C-alpha cells in the first residue's frame, strides 16, 4: 500500500507506483515517476522529468532532477533515469541533463553516498559505489562495478572504465582504463584492481591476463598503440582484455591516463588461496 505523509507535497501529474512511501516534507514535482517500492525520505526534493526505479530509496535532503548547473541550459526537456534498488543518500545531488532529449542515467544497485554530485549528461553504470563528496562534472561516463573513494573530483567528459577503483581525494583529468586501481592528484595508475576483481568472482586466469596486459601497456618500452596490438595478439581470447583494448582505442575528449605509480608492486599474490605470484 502506498503511504504519502500529509505534509509531503506531491504535485498533480506525478506518477506513483504501488507500495511507495513518501515521508514528511518531501517534495515530488508533477513530471516525476516513482516506480513500485520506492521510498522518498523526509525533505528529499525530486523535480523534472525524473524516473526512479523499483526499490530505490532517496534519503533526506537529496535533490534529484533539478535544473543543471550549466549556463548552456535554456529550459529544454531533459531527463533523469535512476535504476532499481539504488541508495541515494543524504544531500546527494543529481541534476537534470542539458540539451533537448538527453538523459542523466544511473544504473541498478548503485550506492550514492552523502554530498555526492552527479552533473548534467552523466552516465553511471550498474553496481557503482560513490563515496562521500564524489563530484562528477558534466558528460562523465562511469562503467559498471566502479568504486570511487571520498572527495574525488572528476573533470568533464572523462570516462571511468568498468571494475576500476579510484582512491580517495584523487583528481581525475583523463580517462581511467577498466579493471585498474589508482590514486593521487595528479592521478597515477597502480595496477589492476586485483581484490575488486576477485570479489566479483573474475577468474584467476583472467586476472593474470589483465595484469600482464597492464604491464605490457604501461610498463614496457613499446609505444602505446603497439602495446595494445601486441596484447591482443597474446591475450585476445580473453574478453576482459579485448574490452580493455577497445576502451583505450575509443575516441576520447580527455585522452587515456598513462601516469603510473612505479613503486606499486605487481608481484603480489593475486589470489591467496591459489597462491600464485606474477613476476615483474
Swiss-Prot record:
Q: Kindly tell me the pathway this chain contributes to.
A: Glycolipid biosynthesis; lipid IV(A) biosynthesis; lipid IV(A) from (3R)-3-hydroxytetradecanoyl-[acyl-carrier-protein] and UDP-N-acetyl-alpha-D-glucosamine: step 1/6
Per the record, the domain of life is Bacteria
Task: Extract one GO BP annotation from the record.
Answer: lipid A biosynthetic process
Broad EC category: transferase
List, alphabetically, the SUPFAM superfamilies matched. Trimeric LpxA-like enzymes
Single GO cellular component annotation? Answer: cytoplasm
The UniProt keyword set, sorted, is: Acyltransferase, Cytoplasm, Lipid A biosynthesis, Lipid biosynthesis, Lipid metabolism, Repeat, Transferase
**Name recorded for this polypeptide:** Acyl-[acyl-carrier-protein]--UDP-N-acetylglucosamine O-acyltransferase
Report the source organism.
Answer: Chlamydia trachomatis serovar D (strain ATCC VR-885 / DSM 19411 / UW-3/Cx)
Source lineage: Bacteria, Pseudomonadati, Chlamydiota, Chlamydiia, Chlamydiales
Instruction: Give the gene that encodes this protein.
Output: lpxA
